Amino acid sequence: MDLPGPIHDFILVFLGSGLILGGLGVVLFTNPIYSAFSLGLVLVCISLFYILSNSHFVAAAQLLIYVGAVNVLIIFAVMFMNGSDYSKDFQLNLWTIGDGLTSLVCTSIFFSLITTILDTSWYGIIWTTRANQIIEQDLISNSQQIGIHLSTDFFLPFELVSIILLVALIGAIAVARQ
């Protein structure tokens, strides 16, 4: 998106703070409905980040798939749960071994990510601007590049994901029949 520098920076900071607050809401809210809506906020902020980086196709896919389908499915699943079932579990706020192990794993992943970011040489990356665009294939749009990569470089993972989705669909139909 071609915005002036200060406006772009303000929107970037606003979306980043929305992303951080939404992520904290997902983890810290004891009510699963509030957590699901916070997850929706996180996914919308990610989609808006894609719009800011001129990846409109990925932003539309993010909105349609994750916000429009997955998050709505999570909200429906939480709404179908009995309210007394999950409210009893959250009244006792003691840490268990699983909570400690999970926080240890997440902290180690976070520090390894920070170490990787700091150790990476970012000078080899070609930064593009509006005046000096460096694009490999000028005539191919973003969605065509995604299609080319999915059918060549990422063919096997793409097919594995389709098989996993097919198995999940068959499993959902089998559970619904019972």
From Swiss-Prot:
Pfam families to which the protein is assigned, alphabetical: Oxidored_q3
The protein's Enzyme Commission number: 7.1.1.-
Coiled coil spans: none
Gene: ndhG
Main location: plastid
Reactions the enzyme catalyzes: a plastoquinone + NADH + (n+1) H(+)(in) = a plastoquinol + NAD(+) + n H(+)(out); a plastoquinone + NADPH + (n+1) H(+)(in) = a plastoquinol + NADP(+) + n H(+)(out)
CC terms in the record's Gene Ontology section: chloroplast thylakoid membrane
Subunit description: NDH is composed of at least 16 different subunits, 5 of which are encoded in the nucleus.
GO molecular function: NADH dehydrogenase (ubiquinone) activity; quinone binding
Name recorded for this polypeptide: NAD(P)H-quinone oxidoreductase subunit 6, chloroplastic
Transmembrane regions: 10-30, 32-52, 61-81, 94-114, 154-174
Family named by the database record: Belongs to the complex I subunit 6 family.
Topology of this chain in the membrane: Multi-pass membrane protein
Protein location: Plastid, Chloroplast thylakoid membrane
Record key words, sorted: Chloroplast, Membrane, NAD, NADP, Plastid, Plastoquinone, Quinone, Thylakoid, Translocase, Transmembrane, Transmembrane helix, Transport
Primary role: NDH shuttles electrons from NAD(P)H:plastoquinone, via FMN and iron-sulfur (Fe-S) centers, to quinones in the photosynthetic chain and possibly in a chloroplast respiratory chain. The immediate electron acceptor for the enzyme in this species is believed to be plastoquinone. Couples the redox reaction to proton translocation, and thus conserves the redox energy in a proton gradient.
Domain of life: Eukaryota
Organism (species): Citrus sinensis (Sweet orange)
